[in-house]
Amino acid sequence: MTYREVLEYLDARPPRGERRGLERMRLLMHKLGDPQRSLRFVHIAGTSGKGSTAAMTERMLRACGYRTGLFVSPHTFDFRERIQLDGVMADKALLAETLTEMRPALDALDAMGDPAAAFETMTALALCVFARKKPDLVVLEVGIGGLLDSTNIIDPPEVAAVCAISVEHTNLLGKTIPEIAAQKCGII
């Protein structure tokens, strides 16, 4: 695959899975050899401020001499903003090579009729990239919620942080602050 094909492939993935939960992500990561198990994480959830908190945390860790990975969403200009190593966007060739290696596992889920959604695929791609490059710590920003978010496929993190919480995504997380907070705190 080329980098352009990576972007096209990700764009063609379904926006959401047929079922909500981590079952599909667990199966995908198992088929990929559970690369996330070789990594240490700082996991960050919240309604607002989580991206800024993730970026600041990554910079502080790097300033302290740690080799870092960073996974955030969405991106502003370049998809590679989502997956960074030591403060630098992931190399296009690295992303293409990694997704090429992931394709048999992704194709297997497709053949089962339960394809990995776009964000699940991006999360898996980031985790596989990080497993290859072996940073000391990965700062991982939750997509939506926490408890059932694809980033919650990791083992308990070194640190879990929950930023400000407000009413959002009520169709997925609940209608009240306590319901939404329970979802976000699912990363702890």
What are these regions (language model features)?
Residues M1, D11, D155-P156, P178:
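ATP-dependent carboxylate-amine ligase
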Residues R16, I144, S166:
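Flexible, active-site-proximal loop/turn residues at the rims of small-molecule/cofactor binding pockets
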Residues M1-G46, T53-A55, R59-C64, L70-F71, ...:
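Short functional linear segments
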Residues L22, R26-R37, A63-D155, N171-G174, ...:
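ATP-dependent carboxylate-amine ligase catalytic core
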Residues A164-N171:
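Conserved Switch II/interswitch segment of TRAFAC-class P-loop GTPases
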Residues I153-A164:
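Inter-motif core of Ras-like GTPase G domains
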Residues G49, H75, S166:
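Short, glycine/serine-rich, charged loops/turns that create anion-binding
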Residues A181-I188:
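Membrane-proximal helix-turn-helix segments that form the acceptor-binding/catalytic region
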